[in-house]
């Protein structure tokens, strides 16, 4: 197991115990991989984390996962064993396969409504990436307006009710990066708490969630990773003490 260090080309296959526990191929700074960590931690599902250098991937990764993508979940107890990709599909599988602490609503209509809101968030994260690259901030704020209204309509502390649910976790990685966006944009950053009163409270509640806390990363660390990536030398091991 990588123990937090990102494995690169030439790295041997990690010595993971043959214990039947799920193996998650991940990257510490990837918001899509973060979704899967959040679900695994929220549901308290045991798993091994294997972090991958996506710039210089280890050769054996393509044997496990021909797409070479993260997140990828290896289900070692199944024949094969199969490797699942795509964060939303992995998270849905986990919620169905491990029914304790359900994250998707049990009601079919509410489940579909949450899925639609997760799908709709694709446009919001697209606007986020453009804003973080110096683009107009307003499309991102306009996208968040939808979730501000929805949280107000539900009248609950979280989108999942009185505890976190799937919608909370699927949009969180980009909401966590609001502080990163603030660093990137400086004086241009114009998040308005009066425009987002419900989301502002939700952000603070989410920061106290155990699953969120387990994978939370300070904006300054995220910014430093992006700085090294912009120089063509991404430091994937910023969080490794002896990196």
Curated annotation (Swiss-Prot):
InterPro entries: Glutathione-S-Trfase_C-like, Glutathione-S-Trfase_C_sf, Glutathione_S-Trfase, Glutathione_S-Trfase_N, GST_omega, GST_Omega/HSP26, Thioredoxin-like_sf. Signal peptide: none annotated. Belongs to the GST superfamily. Omega family. Keywords: Oxidoreductase. This is Pyrimidodiazepine synthase. The keyword Oxidoreductase applies. GO terms for cellular component: cytoplasm. Homodimer. GO terms for biological process: eye pigment biosynthetic process; glutathione metabolic process; pteridine biosynthetic process. It comes from the Eukaryota. Residues 20-102 form the GST N-terminal domain. Glutathione binds at residues 57, 70, 86-87. Pfam families: GST_C_2, GST_N_3. One of its GO terms (molecular function) is glutathione transferase activity. Mediates the conversion of 2-amino-4-oxo-6-pyruvoyl-5,6,7,8-tetrahydropteridine (6-PTP; also named 6-pyruvoyltetrahydropterin) to 2-amino-6-acetyl-3,7,8,9-tetrahydro-3H-pyrimido(4,5-b)[1,4]diazepin-4-one (pyrimidodiazepine or PDA), a key intermediate in red eye pigment drosopterin biosynthesis. It catalyses: 2-amino-6-acetyl-3,7,8,9-tetrahydro-3H-pyrimido[4,5-b][1,4]diazepin-4-one + glutathione disulfide + H2O = 6-pyruvoyl-5,6,7,8-tetrahydropterin + 2 glutathione. Its EC number is 1.5.4.1.
């Amino acid at each position: 197991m990588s123990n937090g260090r990102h494995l690169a080309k030439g790295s041997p296959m990690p010595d993971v115990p043959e214990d039947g526990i799920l193996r998650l191929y991940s990257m510490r700074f990837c918001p899509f991989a973060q979704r899967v960590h959040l679900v695994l931690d929220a549901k308290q599902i045991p798993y091994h984390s294997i972090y991958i250098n996506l710039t210089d991937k280890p050769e054996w990764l393509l044997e496990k996962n021909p797409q070479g993508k993260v997140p990828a979940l290896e289900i070692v107890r199944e024949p094969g064993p199969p490797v699942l990709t795509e964060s939303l599909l992995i998270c849905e599988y986990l919620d169905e396969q491990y029914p304790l602490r359900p994250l998707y609503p049990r009601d079919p209509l509410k489940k579909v409504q949450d899925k639609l809101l997760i799908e709709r968030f694709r446009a919001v994260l697209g606007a986020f990436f453009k804003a973080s690259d110096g683009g107009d901030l307003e499309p991102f704020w306009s996208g968040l307006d939808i979730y501000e209204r929805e949280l107000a309509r539900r009248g609950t502390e979280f989108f999942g009710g009185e505890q976190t649910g799937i919608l909370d976790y699927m949009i969180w990685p980009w909401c966590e990066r609001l502080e990163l966006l603030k660093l990137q944009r400086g004086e241009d950053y114009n998040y308005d708490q009066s425009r987002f009163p419900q989301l502002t409270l939700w952000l603070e509640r989410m920061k106290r969630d155990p699953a969120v806390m387990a994978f939370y990363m300070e904006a300054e660390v995220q910014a430093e990773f992006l700085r090294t990536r912009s120089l063509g030398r991404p430091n994937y091991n910023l969080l490794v003490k002896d990196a």
